[in-house]
Swiss-Prot record:
Disruption phenotype: No visible phenotype, probably due to redundancy with BHLH30. Residues 318-327 have a biased composition (Low complexity). It comes from Arabidopsis thaliana (Mouse-ear cress). Homodimer. Interacts with LHW. The gene is BHLH32. GO terms for cellular component: nucleus. Transcription factor required for MONOPTEROS-dependent root initiation in embryo. Transcriptionally controlled by MONOPTEROS. Keywords: DNA-binding, Nucleus, Transcription, Transcription regulation. This is Transcription factor AIG1. InterPro entries: AIG1-like, bHLH_dom, HLH_DNA-bd_sf.
Length: 344
């Protein structure tokens, strides 16, 4: 029995060395759990008299002929039957089972690269396809997460929503947007809201109770502290007085609607002005041309005010950029003191 065990172990050791030479494992001595040079000689006297289940990993490499191995009973629980070595995939599996965790840690020393070099082209293509499939699955998972995040934001924006599925939620969002658009249209028709672009409109509206012509001037521009001060000076230079004013400010934009009339110094100037407009005493006076001149004068004065707003805004942006570049930080924009003036 002992002689048979000794012969089997020696044969197994030679088989293991042949298998190592086949996979060039002699280039990686650090991954082996034992050293082939320091392997002690087999002593039958130290062999256990009461054999237990043989757990030495080298028993997996027993490649003796069937006549020799037939003397072992693989069903007695002492020795496991040797696996088939016919299929190439069994080589890697058998070696991994024999060497255990040490061989698995050996992948960092280049063993996996050596095995990958022995794979066929079809196996490499299959591995690449598997990696691409995993990458696509990960990208699809991130896309679904982004969509769910956006849907959660929409669900939180809606005032009263009980919808949970995506289709119903999107339909409710569309309906809510239509309602907001309708409300915005009503507000725009009722109240004058500033626009994002500068505009100016001057036209003659109607005659007041005294028969004086009232001119309606509407302009929209960037809001600034001295805007109304410039508007007042422009109107005074044209000897105009404001009958009514409507001012709306939203997001740094301002819209002014002014109803203007001629300002008189005395009663004689007032009568002369009315006669010129009515055309009673001055038959050759072209009333329409006079009105066009008056409207053009107001347009030029208010246009200069709007252009000053644009120029000041550009200078303010340049100064802010210069302060940021020089100090490396963001400084608070300087503002001039606002002057409130009232006029009749």
């Amino acid at each position: 029995m002992y002689a048979m065990k000794e012969e089997d172990c020696l044969q197994t050791f030679h088989n293991l060395q042949d298998y190592q030479d086949q996979f060039h494992l002699h280039h990686h001595p650090q991954i082996l759990p034992w050293s082939s040079t320091s392997l002690p000689s087999f002593d039958p006297l130290h062999f256990p008299s009461n054999p237990t289940r043989y757990s030495d990993p080298v028993h997996y490499f027993n490649r003796r002929a069937s006549s020799s191995s037939s003397s072992f009973d693989y069903n007695d629980g002492f020795v496991s039957p040797p696996p088939s070595m016919d299929h190439p995939q069994n080589h890697l599996r058998i070696l991994s089972e024999a060497l255990g965790p040490i061989m698995r840690r050996g992948s960092s020393f280049g063993f996996d690269g050596e095995i990958m070099g022995k794979l066929s082209a079809q196996e490499v293509m299959d591995a690449k396809a598997l990696a691409a499939s995993k990458s696509h699955s990960e990208a699809e998972r991130r896309r679904r997460e982004r969509i769910n995040t956006h849907l959660a934001k929409l669900r939180s924006i809606l005032p009263n929503t009980t919808k949970t599925d995506k289709a119903s939620l999107l339909a409710e969002v569309i309906q809510h947007m239509k309602e907001l658009k309708r409300q915005t249209s009503q507000i725009t028709d009722t109240y004058q809201v500033p626009t994002e672009c500068d505009d100016l409109t001057v036209d003659s509206s109607y005659n007041d109770e005294e028969g004086n012509l009232v001119i309606r001037a509407s302009f929209c521009c960037q809001d600034r502290t001295d805007l109304m001060h410039d508007v007042i000076n422009a109107l005074k230079s044209l000897r105009l007085r404001t009958l009514k004013a409507e001012i709306a400010t939203v997001g740094g934009r301002v819209k002014n609607i002014l109803f203007l009339s001629r300002e008189y110094d005395d009663e004689e100037d007032h009568d002369s002005y009315r006669r010129n407009f009515d055309g009673d005493d001055v038959e050759d006076y072209d009333e329409e041309r006079m009105m066009n001149n008056r409207v053009s004068s107001i347009e030029e004065a208010l246009k200069a005010v709007i252009e000053k707003c644009v120029h000041n805004n550009d200078e303010s942006n340049d100064n802010n950029n210069l302060e940021k570049s020089s100090s490396g930080g963001i400084k608070r924009q300087r503002t001039s003191k606002m002057v409130n003036r009232c006029y009749n």
